[in-house]
C-alpha cells in the first residue's frame, strides 16, 4: 500500500521513504496512521518516518488534539489557521483551511487571517480564540483577564487542549 502523498516532500532533505525500503516498524506505524482518521501520511510525518516510535507517539497526540479535543473541531481548526499564519506555515494552511471551512469557518474569515488582518464578524468563540492566540504570540503568556475568559468558556481541560495546539 502506498501511504504517501508525494509532492514538495520529494525535494526535502528527508523525503518520503518508499514502501519497499521501510523497516517493519515503519510499515506498522504507517499502516496504523493511514487506517486512522487522517487516512494518509503527509506533512510532518514524512521526516518523522525516520523515527517510527516518535512518529507514532506524536501522531497520537495530534489525533487527540485534532479529532477528540474538548474545544470542538471547528474551533481547533480555526486555531490551527491562526497559528499557521503566525508562523508562516503554508503547508499547514493548505491542509487545514478546507477543513476549517467545511466545519463552518467563513471563507472571508480565512481570507482575513491569510492576509494578516483581524477578521470581521467572528463568532464569540472565534473572537476569544483569536485574542488568546494573538496574546500568546505577542506576550508569550496570557493576562489574567484573557485566561479567565478562556477558562470560563472551555474549562481547564479546554484551556490545555487549545493551548496545546499552539
PLM features: what roles do these ranges have?
Residues 1-71:
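Mobile cap/lid helix-loop segments that border enzyme active or cofactor-binding sites
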Residues 23, 155-156:
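Transmembrane-helix boundary/entry motifs in multi-pass membrane transporters
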Residues 39, 56-61, 77, 93-95, ...:
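A generic alpha-helix surface/boundary motif
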Residues 44-48, 58-65, 78-84, 113-114, ...:
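Short alpha-helical scaffolding segments that buttress acidic/His motifs in well-ordered protein cores
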Residues 54-57, 71, 75-103, 107:
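Conserved alpha-helical segments that form or flank metal/cofactor-binding pockets of metalloenzymes
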Residues 97-123:
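Histidine/lysine/aspartate-rich catalytic loop segments that bind and position anionic ligands
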Residues 119-147, 151:
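Strongly charged, low-complexity linkers/loops
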Amino acid at each position: 500500500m502506498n501511504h504517501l502523498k508525494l509532492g514538495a516532500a520529494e525535494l526535502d532533505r528527508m523525503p518520503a521513504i518508499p514502501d519497499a525500503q521501510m523497516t517493519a516498524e515503519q510499515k506498522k506505524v504507517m499502516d496504523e496512521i493511514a487506517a486512522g482518521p487522517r487516512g494518509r501520511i503527509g506533512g510532518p510525518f514524512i521526516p518523522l518516518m525516520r523515527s517510527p516510535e516518535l512518529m507514532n507517539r506524536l501522531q497520537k497526540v495530534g489525533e487527540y488534539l485534532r479529532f477528540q479535543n474538548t474545544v470542538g473541531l471547528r474551533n481547533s481548526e480555526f486555531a490551527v489557521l491562526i497559528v499557521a499564519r503566525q508562523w508562516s506555515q503554508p503547508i499547514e494552511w493548505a491542509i487545514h483551511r478546507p477543513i476549517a471551512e467545511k466545519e463552518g469557518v467563513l471563507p472571508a474569515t480565512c481570507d482575513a487571517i491569510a492576509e494578516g488582518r483581524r477578521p470581521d464578524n467572528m463568532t464569540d468563540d472565534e473572537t476569544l480564540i483569536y485574542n488568546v492566540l494573538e496574546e500568546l504570540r505577542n506576550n508569550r503568556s496570557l493576562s489574567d483577564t484573557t485566561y479567565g475568559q478562556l477558562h470560563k468558556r472551555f474549562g481547564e481541560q479546554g484551556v490545555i487542549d487549545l493551548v496545546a495546539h499552539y
